[in-house]
Amino acid sequence: MKYSMITLGAFAMMAVAQLSSLPACGQTCISNMLALAPTFGCTANDASCLCSDVNFAYGIRDCSNAACGAEAAGPVIAYGVEYCSSAGVGLSGSATGIDPGLGPATAVVASTPIATDGASAGSLSAITTSEFTSYVISGDSTVSTIVGSTTIYGPAAGSSSAITTSPIVSTVTSGDTSYPTTVGSTTIFGVAGVISTPTASASSALDSLSSSIASEASVITSSASAAVSSLSSRLSSAASPVSTTTSSAGGARQTAFAGLAAAAGFAAIIL
């Protein structure tokens, strides 16, 4: 038992030493595959368990080919073979990339949008962040590995620049007169969209408009009153002669009647 522990410790130290000699892309592939131990039903650093699943070796092979290129992938694949051989598990065929006749596994990289907390980079804010997941498919088995992420940034709301600004005009019509007044404005920003912002003088503009309308109405009312008064005066002036004439006519009729009566009486006396 003691011998086994010493051997395991020596193997772990050797593996660490060899891993550091690999290119950065290869170290990432090995680290990612080792981190998938729970996916393979293994505990961390259980080489025998990991290497017993051929998908572990396929993952190292395909990841190194995709990340490092075919030429630089050789040392990474060799590391995987040595790693499993030291644990007593031999690898051969397509897992090592030596025998393509067995059919290579298929590596698929997909991006999946994930929620963003709105963190900003300088004056930019994150719009969406996507994870890049590598799926290694061999037969009916699929192994997924998150190999990175990408974030799309856009200008923060506070740093948006206005594209165009248009006034909001209110028009009040009184009779044949119209009173246009700017009561606000609407601004289209590059990111924030359409933001409607009332002007600070909107209230005073409306008050001024109301006063103007009231003043115009007062002038119209005063003019109308003056016109009515003038018309009444003219009618009164015109009515007085008529009344006098009527009165005079009545008087004339009365005078004529009296003359006729006197003439009739005079005629009666003669008769």
UniProtKB/Swiss-Prot annotation:
Lipid attachment points (GPI-anchor amidated serine): 247
SS bond list: 25-68, 29-63, 42-49, 51-84
GO CC terms: extracellular space; host cell nucleus; host cell plasma membrane; plasma membrane; side of membrane
Pro-peptide region(s): 248-271
Membrane keyword on record: yes
Record's keyword annotation contains Signal: yes
Membrane topology: Lipid-anchor; GPI-anchor
Top-rank taxon: Eukaryota
BP-aspect Gene Ontology terms: biological process involved in interaction with host
Membership in a protein family: Belongs to the RBT5 family.
Domain free text: The CFEM domain is involved in heme-binding and contains 8 cysteines and is found in proteins from several pathogenic fungi, including both human and plant pathogens. The CFEM domain adopts a novel helical-basket fold that consists of six alpha-helices, and is uniquely stabilized by four disulfide bonds formed by its 8 signature cysteines.
Name this protein carries in UniProt: Effector CFEM6
Organism, scientific name: Marssonina brunnea f. sp. multigermtubi (strain MB_m1) (Marssonina leaf spot fungus)
UniProt gene name: CFEM6
